[in-house]
Amino acid sequence: MSLIYLVVLALVQGITEFLPISSSAHLILAPQVLGQADQGPLIDVMAHAGSLLAVLVYFRSDIVSVAMGKLALLQGRVTPGGRLALLVAASMPPIIIVAGALVAFDLVDALRSPRVIAIATLAFALPLWLADRYGRQTITIETMSFKHAALIGIAQLFALIPGASRSGVTMTAARGLGLTRTDSARFSMLMAIPVIAAFGLVSLIELVRADGMAAGASLSDGLIVAGLSFVTAWAAIAVLMRLVERIGFLPFALYRVGLGLALLVFFV
């Protein structure tokens, strides 16, 4: 696997994982655009590991608060960190159940086609813009209810469609429910932690089944991808948090329209 291809994969994973433009769509398309074989489970594991580390480092104060809050919950006390942990947990059941069923019945790849990606990329652009344009900004993570968290979790199911974007659908739902722009992005990325960890675990299981290596990837390849994914993901999160506060989600909606149209012309 060439160094250039590894760099492209790492940049795509890191930049798009937390932006509302679908990392899975870009990662699925990268091998086809560059004429390479699928990157295989080792690269998937390391790319997810780099992205996961980036969000943990960027939101380290939240992570520490959640960790301390969980200890307090065990002692019967509810702290802001403990409540945040419960909110994230309340958003998880739908994706765990449905994604688990897809994995169990080997249906994960059923929708992985350029046509589906193109349509989903276009279809979810307008809701993102509408929710941001007309959604109130009256609710913060500190004031959101468990009902809000559950509804955002249900919306996350659309992320199982390649091209929909996990961060995109959760941020859209959060803005539609009235969360502020920054807290919509923040809660979406905190929700990403267990999701990325779970999908990384699935890729790790595939890696073990593949007897260690796949698609010509080596451990050094994986380390390159992990390192670059970490750096680019951290930078992407920083840019996203500043951008949504100042401008909103319109640039991402416009990007989705452009990408979707390009995919339709190029692949369909």
Swiss-Prot record:
Enzyme Commission code: 3.6.1.27
GO molecular function terms noted in the UniProt entry: undecaprenyl-diphosphatase activity
Reaction equation(s) it catalyzes: di-trans,octa-cis-undecaprenyl diphosphate + H2O = di-trans,octa-cis-undecaprenyl phosphate + phosphate + H(+)
Membrane topology designation: Multi-pass membrane protein
Pfam families (UniProt xref): BacA (PF02673)
Keywords for this protein: Antibiotic resistance, Cell inner membrane, Cell membrane, Cell shape, Cell wall biogenesis/degradation, Hydrolase, Membrane, Peptidoglycan synthesis, Transmembrane, Transmembrane helix
Keyword check for Transmembrane helix: yes
Subcellular location: Cell inner membrane
Main enzyme class: hydrolase
Single Gene Ontology BP annotation: response to antibiotic
A single Gene Ontology CC term: plasma membrane
Regions that span the bilayer: 1-21, 39-59, 85-105, 110-130, 144-164, 187-207, 221-241, 247-267
Family: Belongs to the UppP family.
Further comment found in the protein's record: Bacitracin is thought to be involved in the inhibition of peptidoglycan synthesis by sequestering undecaprenyl diphosphate, thereby reducing the pool of lipid carrier available.
Function of the molecule: Catalyzes the dephosphorylation of undecaprenyl diphosphate (UPP). Confers resistance to bacitracin.
HAMAP family assigned to the protein according to its UniProt record, in alphabetical order: Undec_diphosphatase
Protein name stated in the entry: Undecaprenyl-diphosphatase
Organism: Maricaulis maris (strain MCS10)
Chain's gene name: uppP
